[in-house]
Amino acid sequence: MDKFVKLTGVAAPLPVVNIDTDMIIPKDYLKTIKRTGLGTGLFAEARYNEDGTPNPDFVLNKPAYQNAKILVAGDNFGCGSSREHAPWALLDFGIRCVISTSFADIFYNNCFKNGILPIVVSQADLDKLMDDANRGSNAVLSIDLEAQEITGPDGGSIKFEIDAFKRHCLLNGLDDIGLTLEKAGAIDTFEKSTAASRPWA
């Protein structure tokens, strides 16, 4: 998993509340267990017309936001089913950070396991960031995870809170496998000790 220390990129505004995982990645894209290639299905029902052509009115199809790295979204983002394909699709598109006033718990935790930083802010701060995101190609935000700070295009900053353990994992690029490998030495020592003390086991 890639480390997340600092991120600077265009932020796309998506001022919709209760965006569920079915909206993020429709069920038609759940047949694969590969994490790559799902970016094409991200928000597919809103992003494409019935004939499969891109919907020019959808934010991520607009030239200024086609390479967005940050999503500023409405309340209760990621609700619905627990499909891990949702953060996979966001990451494959290039989104490394989602900012909202709240997230569904399972989606929130899945983000950290896949290298995405979900940031919870107040409604007032979200309104300010949504205004920033509406600046098109000038909608550049900087996220500093070490300082726990968001800096807007005008230089103003917003602090955010994050669980210390989750922060550690993102800063060091540690998913569940990485966390286990961090303890490889201790695991090996334990196994050798157990084998020596219980040769019959």
UniProtKB/Swiss-Prot annotation:
Q: Which family does it belong to?
A: Belongs to the LeuD family. LeuD type 1 subfamily.
Single GO biological process annotation from the record: L-leucine biosynthetic process
Matching CDD domains: IPMI_Swivel
Q: What is its EC number?
A: 4.2.1.33
Task: Name the keywords, alphabetized.
Answer: Amino-acid biosynthesis, Branched-chain amino acid biosynthesis, Leucine biosynthesis, Lyase
The record, for Pfam families, names: Aconitase_C (PF00694)
Q: Which GO terms describe its molecular function?
A: 3-isopropylmalate dehydratase activity
Q: How does it assemble?
A: Heterodimer of LeuC and LeuD.
Query: InterPro entries per the record?
Result: 3-IsopropMal_deHydase_ssu, Aconitase/3IPM_dehydase_swvl, AconitaseA/IPMdHydase_ssu_swvl, IPMI_Swivel, LeuD
| Listed pathway(s) | Amino-acid biosynthesis; L-leucine biosynthesis; L-leucine from 3-methyl-2-oxobutanoate: step 2/4
Protein name per its UniProtKB record: 3-isopropylmalate dehydratase small subunit
The protein's role, per its UniProt record:
Catalyzes the isomerization between 2-isopropylmalate and 3-isopropylmalate, via the formation of 2-isopropylmaleate.
Keyword set includes 4Fe-4S: no
One of the record's GO cellular component terms: 3-isopropylmalate dehydratase complex
Which chemical reaction does it catalyze? (2R,3S)-3-isopropylmalate = (2S)-2-isopropylmalate
